[in-house]
Amino acid sequence: NQIGWSGVRKRKKNLLTLIEEKINNLGEENVKILDVAGGTGNYLFDIKEKYPKVEILINEFKKSNIEVGEEVIKKNNLENISFVNYDCFDKETYKKINYTPNIVIISGVFELFEDNNMLENTISGVAEILDKNGAIIYTGQPWHPQLKQIALVLNSHKGNNKSWLMRRR
Protein backbone atom coordinates (compact mmCIF):
# COMPACT_ATOMS: atom_id res chain seq x y z
CA ASN A 1 0.00 0.00 0.00
CA GLN A 2 2.90 2.36 -0.57
CA ILE A 3 1.94 5.70 -2.02
CA GLY A 4 3.72 4.96 -5.32
CA TRP A 5 1.64 1.83 -5.95
CA SER A 6 -1.49 3.72 -5.02
CA GLY A 7 -0.56 6.19 -7.76
CA VAL A 8 -0.03 3.37 -10.27
CA ARG A 9 -3.51 2.01 -9.49
CA LYS A 10 -5.03 5.48 -9.90
CA ARG A 11 -3.19 5.95 -13.19
CA LYS A 12 -4.63 2.65 -14.44
CA LYS A 13 -8.13 3.71 -13.39
CA ASN A 14 -7.77 7.09 -15.10
CA LEU A 15 -6.30 5.49 -18.22
CA LEU A 16 -9.18 3.00 -18.45
CA THR A 17 -11.68 5.84 -18.00
CA LEU A 18 -10.13 7.81 -20.88
CA ILE A 19 -10.00 4.75 -23.15
CA GLU A 20 -13.62 3.86 -22.40
CA GLU A 21 -14.72 7.43 -23.04
CA LYS A 22 -13.06 7.40 -26.46
CA ILE A 23 -14.49 3.93 -27.27
CA ASN A 24 -17.98 5.16 -26.41
CA ASN A 25 -17.51 8.24 -28.61
CA LEU A 26 -16.30 6.21 -31.59
CA GLY A 27 -18.61 3.22 -31.21
CA GLU A 28 -17.17 -0.13 -30.14
CA GLU A 29 -17.31 -1.73 -33.61
CA ASN A 30 -15.08 0.99 -35.07
CA VAL A 31 -12.30 1.07 -32.50
CA LYS A 32 -8.70 0.08 -33.21
CA ILE A 33 -6.29 0.54 -30.32
CA LEU A 34 -2.50 0.55 -30.53
CA ASP A 35 -0.39 0.52 -27.39
CA VAL A 36 3.14 1.53 -28.38
CA ALA A 37 4.89 -0.24 -25.49
CA GLY A 38 2.19 -2.27 -23.81
CA GLY A 39 4.10 -4.66 -21.59
CA THR A 40 1.99 -7.74 -20.94
CA GLY A 41 -1.17 -5.94 -22.07
CA ASN A 42 -2.58 -6.03 -18.56
CA TYR A 43 -5.12 -3.19 -18.58
CA LEU A 44 -6.05 -3.82 -22.21
CA PHE A 45 -7.43 -7.20 -21.19
CA ASP A 46 -9.88 -5.27 -18.99
CA ILE A 47 -10.89 -3.26 -22.06
CA LYS A 48 -11.22 -6.39 -24.19
CA GLU A 49 -13.46 -8.05 -21.61
CA LYS A 50 -15.79 -5.06 -21.49
CA TYR A 51 -15.62 -4.24 -25.22
CA PRO A 52 -15.12 -7.52 -27.10
CA LYS A 53 -15.53 -5.94 -30.57
CA VAL A 54 -12.61 -3.56 -30.09
CA GLU A 55 -9.49 -4.46 -32.07
CA ILE A 56 -6.26 -4.17 -30.06
CA LEU A 57 -2.63 -4.32 -31.14
CA ILE A 58 0.07 -4.24 -28.48
CA ASN A 59 3.63 -3.45 -29.45
CA GLU A 60 6.19 -4.63 -26.92
CA PHE A 61 9.98 -4.90 -27.12
CA LYS A 62 10.41 -7.52 -24.40
CA LYS A 63 9.59 -11.00 -25.66
CA SER A 64 8.97 -12.34 -22.14
CA ASN A 65 6.16 -9.77 -21.74
CA ILE A 66 4.67 -10.85 -25.05
CA GLU A 67 4.73 -14.49 -23.95
CA VAL A 68 2.84 -13.64 -20.75
CA GLY A 69 0.27 -11.61 -22.68
CA GLU A 70 -0.22 -14.28 -25.33
CA GLU A 71 -0.87 -16.84 -22.58
CA VAL A 72 -3.67 -14.64 -21.24
CA ILE A 73 -5.13 -14.31 -24.75
CA LYS A 74 -5.03 -18.08 -25.23
CA LYS A 75 -6.36 -18.91 -21.76
CA ASN A 76 -9.32 -16.55 -22.18
CA ASN A 77 -9.98 -17.28 -25.88
CA LEU A 78 -9.73 -13.60 -26.73
CA GLU A 79 -10.08 -12.48 -30.33
CA ASN A 80 -8.84 -9.38 -32.16
CA ILE A 81 -6.05 -8.72 -29.69
CA SER A 82 -2.45 -9.47 -30.55
CA PHE A 83 1.16 -8.50 -30.00
CA VAL A 84 3.95 -7.35 -32.27
CA ASN A 85 7.60 -6.98 -31.38
CA TYR A 86 9.02 -3.74 -32.79
CA ASP A 87 11.12 -0.85 -31.51
CA CYS A 88 8.60 1.75 -30.37
CA PHE A 89 11.21 4.51 -30.82
CA ASP A 90 11.80 3.75 -34.51
CA LYS A 91 9.56 6.02 -36.56
CA GLU A 92 9.43 3.39 -39.32
CA THR A 93 7.94 0.83 -36.92
CA TYR A 94 4.53 2.36 -37.33
CA LYS A 95 4.54 1.95 -41.10
CA LYS A 96 5.71 -1.67 -40.73
CA ILE A 97 2.81 -2.72 -38.56
CA ASN A 98 0.31 -1.69 -41.25
CA TYR A 99 -2.35 -0.59 -38.78
CA THR A 100 -4.52 2.53 -38.62
CA PRO A 101 -5.53 3.00 -35.00
CA ASN A 102 -7.98 5.57 -33.76
CA ILE A 103 -6.72 5.27 -30.20
CA VAL A 104 -3.00 5.20 -29.44
CA ILE A 105 -1.78 4.65 -25.92
CA ILE A 106 1.59 5.88 -24.70
CA SER A 107 1.73 5.04 -21.02
CA GLY A 108 4.58 4.42 -18.63
CA VAL A 109 7.35 4.50 -21.21
CA PHE A 110 8.55 8.03 -21.98
CA GLU A 111 9.71 8.76 -18.45
CA LEU A 112 12.16 5.86 -18.65
CA PHE A 113 14.31 7.23 -21.48
CA GLU A 114 16.48 10.32 -21.57
CA ASP A 115 16.80 10.87 -25.34
CA ASN A 116 14.06 13.25 -26.47
CA ASN A 117 14.72 12.36 -30.12
CA MET A 118 13.55 8.82 -29.38
CA LEU A 119 10.29 10.19 -28.00
CA GLU A 120 9.85 12.50 -30.97
CA ASN A 121 10.30 9.50 -33.29
CA THR A 122 7.48 7.69 -31.50
CA ILE A 123 5.13 10.65 -31.68
CA SER A 124 5.95 11.33 -35.35
CA GLY A 125 5.51 7.68 -36.29
CA VAL A 126 2.20 7.44 -34.48
CA ALA A 127 0.95 10.72 -36.00
CA GLU A 128 1.53 9.32 -39.49
CA ILE A 129 -0.73 6.30 -38.95
CA LEU A 130 -3.33 7.68 -36.54
CA ASP A 131 -6.85 7.92 -37.95
CA LYS A 132 -7.88 11.54 -38.62
CA ASN A 133 -10.49 11.35 -35.84
CA GLY A 134 -8.15 9.48 -33.53
CA ALA A 135 -6.65 10.32 -30.17
CA ILE A 136 -3.37 9.76 -28.40
CA ILE A 137 -3.79 8.95 -24.73
CA TYR A 138 -0.59 9.70 -22.84
CA THR A 139 0.22 9.14 -19.19
CA GLY A 140 3.33 10.01 -17.27
CA GLN A 141 4.50 10.11 -13.70
CA PRO A 142 5.98 13.59 -13.35
CA TRP A 143 5.33 13.87 -9.62
CA HIS A 144 5.81 10.26 -8.55
CA PRO A 145 6.46 10.44 -4.80
CA GLN A 146 8.98 7.60 -4.76
CA LEU A 147 11.36 8.41 -7.62
CA LYS A 148 14.43 8.09 -5.41
CA GLN A 149 13.29 4.79 -3.91
CA ILE A 150 12.57 3.38 -7.37
CA ALA A 151 16.06 4.35 -8.52
CA LEU A 152 17.63 2.63 -5.55
CA VAL A 153 15.49 -0.53 -5.41
CA LEU A 154 14.33 -1.58 -8.87
CA ASN A 155 16.52 -3.12 -11.55
CA SER A 156 16.93 -1.17 -14.75
CA HIS A 157 14.46 -1.80 -17.54
CA LYS A 158 17.42 -1.73 -19.94
CA GLY A 159 19.17 -4.76 -18.46
CA ASN A 160 22.43 -2.88 -17.96
CA ASN A 161 22.60 -3.06 -14.14
CA LYS A 162 22.28 0.71 -13.84
CA SER A 163 19.85 2.25 -11.38
CA TRP A 164 16.31 2.76 -12.57
CA LEU A 165 15.74 6.39 -13.45
CA MET A 166 12.41 8.03 -14.19
CA ARG A 167 12.38 11.45 -15.82
CA ARG A 168 9.73 14.04 -15.25
CA ARG A 169 8.12 14.77 -18.60
Region roles according to the model:
Residues 133-140:
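Conserved beta-strand signature within the Rossmann-like core of class I S-adenosyl-L-methionine
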Residues 120-132:
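A short glycine-rich, Lys/Arg-flanked "PGG" loop and its adjoining helix->strand segment in the class I
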Residues 40-52:
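Conserved SAM-binding loop of SAM-dependent methyltransferases across substrates and taxa
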Residues 1-26:
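Conserved Class I S-adenosyl-L-methionine-dependent methyltransferase catalytic core
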Residues 69-70:
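Conserved SAM-binding loop
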Residues 149-169:
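Conserved Class I S-adenosyl-L-methionine
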Residues 105:
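A conserved beta-strand element that flanks and buttresses the S-adenosyl-L-methionine
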Residues 62-64:
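Conserved SAM/SAH-binding beta-strand->alpha-helix loop
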